[in-house]
Amino acid sequence: MNSNGPLMEHGKRRVAYYYDSNIGNYYYGQGHVMKPHRIRMTHHLVLNYGLYRNLEIFRPFPASFEDMTRFHSDEYMTFLKSANPDNLKSFNKQMLKFNVGEDCPLFDGLYEFCQLSSGGSLAAATKLNKQKVDIAINWMGGLHHAKKSEASGFCYTNDIVLGILELLKYHKRVLYVDIDVHHGDGVEEAFYTTDRVMTVSFHKYGDFFPGTGDLKDIGAGKGKLYSVNVPLRDGITDVSYQSIFKPIMTKVMERFDPCAVVLQCGADSLNGDRLGPFNLTLKGHGECARFFRSYNVPLMMVGGGGYTPRNVARCWTYETSIAVDKEVPNELPYNDYFEYFGPNYRLHIESSNAANENSSDMLAKLQTDVIANLEQLTFVPSVQMRPIPEDALSALNDDSLIADQANPDKRLPPQITDGMIQDDGDFYDGEREGDDRRNESDAKRAAQFESEGGEKRQKTE
């Protein structure tokens, strides 16, 4: 058994954050609800709130063809690499075969977009495997609908599956939790027959994409009971959501005893989303991240859905603050996208007066049924000892080796200094702050981050 009990709430965590400024340049097309620009908006809020001081910020290496074909088929990845808007007429049959078209359009730079999303999750998993950090964040990832040989639901490559496969090299059991409003079908399907990965999805069920995720879908073969689905109805509130989330996840942590956790933080479960009918606020959504942060388990946090960009940026910024355990004010800091957050320019959003179709009795029965299945897990699955496979992203540098071999009379290379975090003592005001000279320096540094798109001080990994 792991010593995975809850820690003191304010325990310090080492947090890595993966971002590439190019991610915001990709465009699904006019009228499409998926806006990669929301990730750039998130990044600017993270920087201007000063959260970068508590993060190790990295620019991930793009995932290679070989990295992505650890899950996806060679034929599918060859298509994504070869097709583009200029030659799409040559790929009509393949577009139909691989479900690339209306919902999943073929846009300029699609393959490179997939490389960034997948590369971030692979790098995050590798960093956790090496025990260099406790939490790794990739808001560029979370594309949970993609299948082995098929695009689906605005997702082309499943960075989550790739990240979990990487985590499994070092961790016997990995827990995947999905709080997107849509069922995490691509991840569930990938691990439906294994007991080394438990997938848990809280989602809207019924006449709603992708139409999967019934309570009765519990896995097959060795994976029976290791797929957990919590189908919900419209209008669920923070209180109702947490009334079922916490008891179920507490039982999952007890019975499955994961060695690592991947949390998909899809923001389309928030009130006001263009596609989602839930009624969560940032506080209710963020409470899920806070729950897992309280455990002594390596945690990967990834993005996902979210189709009201200003609220996506709010949500993932808030959950970054939870990861580093820093309170941030409700007043939004000025940033390049400040006007997007009007008219109130506040971090937190309010719930609406929409009807909550999830009655207490319905949620109680749902909880009872899910926990009854979990109680049938009589033991924690074991794994045979075996050599650890080679890491993905073999280009990762060994930071400690670089530091050890550096000339003491010369400045450390930026690959090292970019990942360094300031000591907590740097953030006191007044006398403890050295007459506030450091605050002034930090303000200049934040401005430099903003003006340069956050690139200059990022560490490539």
From Swiss-Prot:
Gene Ontology MF annotations: histone deacetylase activity; histone deacetylase activity, hydrolytic mechanism; RNA polymerase II-specific DNA-binding transcription factor binding
EC primary class: hydrolase
EC number: 3.5.1.98
Tissue: Ubiquitously expressed throughout embryonic and postembryonic development.
GO biological process: cell differentiation; chromatin organization; determination of adult lifespan; embryo development ending in birth or egg hatching; embryonic digestive tract morphogenesis; gonad development; hermaphrodite somatic sex determination; heterochromatin formation
InterPro entries for this protein: HDAC_PDAC (IPR050284), His_deacetylse (IPR000286), His_deacetylse_1 (IPR003084), His_deacetylse_dom (IPR023801), His_deacetylse_dom_sf (IPR037138), Ureohydrolase_dom_sf (IPR023696)
Catalyzed reactions per annotation: N(6)-acetyl-L-lysyl-[histone] + H2O = L-lysyl-[histone] + acetate
Biased composition (Basic and acidic residues): 429-461
Example of a GO cellular component annotation carried by this entry: NuRD complex
Consequence recorded when altering K444R: Does not affect the piRNA-mediated silencing pathway but. Has fewer progeny at all temperatures with progeny number declining further in subsequent generation at 25 degrees C
Compartments in which it is found: Nucleus; Cytoplasm; Chromosome
Record annotation: effect of changing H145F: Loss of function
Catalytic residues (UniProt): H145
UniProt xrefs under SUPFAM superfamilies: Arginase/deacetylase
Name this polypeptide is given: Histone deacetylase 1
Organism (species): Caenorhabditis elegans
